[in-house]
Amino acid sequence: MASNKINSLVARNTENAPKSIGPYSQTVAFSHYNNLSAQLPIDPKSGKIVAGGVKEQTEQCFKNIKAILESIDHVMNDVVRITVFVKNIKDVDTVDEVYKTFFPTYVPTRTTVAVAALPLNALVQIEALVSNGEGTIPNAPQAGNLIKLINNTANAPICSLSAQTVSFSHYNNLSAQLPIDPKTGRLITGGVKEQAQQCLKNIKAILNSIDVPFDDIVKINIFLKNLSDIEDVDEVYATFFPDSAIARAVAYVPARTIVAVSDLSMHALVQIEAVVSHGDGTPPQAIEDRHGIVINANNTENAPKNSLSTQTVAFSHYNHISAQLPIDPKTGKMIAGGVKEQAEQCLKNIKAILESISHGMEDVVKVNIFLKNITDSELVDEVYTTFFPGGIPARRTVGVSALQNDALIQIDVVVSNAEGTPLKA
């Protein structure tokens, strides 16, 4: 492959959206996707949170997303997935009213969770993943004529404000699934085990409806009301992954992130989101080309291992890394020290994973930071800038009520994969 045909990271910022409150870009495009930093309800003119309640704040978040998209010649209809973080789950109805005005006809996939804290004491923070049909090969824009495929099936819960699945190019994003029985539209009865099973059943039903195998999932995000329920969820999880005989033969499990939330819609105990490889592509990409792309899953001894998640799962031009806790891979235990030392260990683990697959921190497109104390952001940034001196990747920071191992911080990343994942001869 000629070097001039390789995608490169394109980080961009506009004056029409708030200046980042940390070392990160507003949007980073790579190949067929644009990863936006989570937007806070900041007025770009004043640099402060807008006056008013959750309605005004939601409006401002979406205005900021729209301004970023317009600055890169994109529109709201190019949004593939929206993630809404609220401080209070009761505010979701108000958020929805505003949401409809920005997505009057087409609706992307969506995840909504209530978290313990948001930067600047905001009531809402909204993040968008956006299609990028023109690609990012320097001086060689593609036709930009790829289309999104939107699907809904009656075999999974249907929502008027979100699509169950939106495919674009070689990825498929699913709306986070709640433990809703699609027949009744209500939460199923039972505890967290039954709920986790229903979430995964719903994901399976959505994938079945578009002829995509369950093992094509590359990344799973689990949102838990009580972090102590993780063992029960894991018990159910292990019955779903690996799914096929082929996946079992290689013990394939997707990359994974576990997030403690303060509340979920319908007061569910668990909600699960999936990112899926989509070998068929979307028109005009040819379906038969799928045979040339495979999932590459890797683990290294130099980072903490987990039997229920792979450290890095690459497919096509992206690489998904499991959330890293401040665990020393040599001892398998949490390192000593405060949030700075912990942030450094998380980033060291990420770096070790990337180096094991011949990548580096400069390939990171997006960083997700989960903090026990949102006020630790500045301390984290002191360490963060030593790993990302240019402050290039897009970023999202949320405050969580708890982290596994009583950690103070957890970090996961999305990474560019310029070489793709061709079938090895």
Residue ranges and their predicted role:
Residues M1-K63, A67-V80, V86-K201, A205-K219, ...:
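N-terminal presequence-like segments and the immediate start of the first folded domain
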